[in-house]
Amino acid sequence: PVTFPYEGTPCDNRNLNRTTMFQYMEDKSSNQWDFKRFNTEHFKRFDKRIQELMVLGIEADLILFHPYDRWGFDGMGAENDDFYVQYVIARYAAYRNIWWSLANEYDYVKTKTIDDWERIASVIVREDPYVRMRSIHNGPQFYDFSKDWVTHCSCQGTDRHKATELTTEFRNKYKKPVVWDEVLYEG
């Protein structure tokens, strides 16, 4: 990344490229972040992108957490997670094209439990005055989309035929819209 959400010092990223991108560090202790001081320049870049998408009529599914994190933002602890989510909601909820995605491939984020995801969801529900769309994206394990806070089923799958079958099944089961985010990674 060019910028980071917090003030502080990241681990050494000099050798980070397309080839090394998925070689994750188990020890993230070389990152030195102040989780109480946001890097506003980082968020200004997002401000601009979200506004540009809005002008184009494109929805922005804002992913709050992800498992591909060598910087330690996936393991900040409950207090810092909640503070981060409150900040992001205060900053972006007023954009009419924002959706909240608690995580990309939530089941690969080993630092969070289902209770953590439910707590984070409750922060979003409590803090978002505009009641933007909310969901959580899966890896191999679908989330329980029957939860009241979930507004739509955010799904990933690599089999387009199975996705078609599951769309009907999920619509009938959860009575919510079904969005397939990564069907065969088109594009």
Q: How would you describe each model-predicted region?
A:
Residues S146-G187:
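Glycan-recognition surfaces
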Residues P1-A163:
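Active-site mouth of glycoside hydrolases
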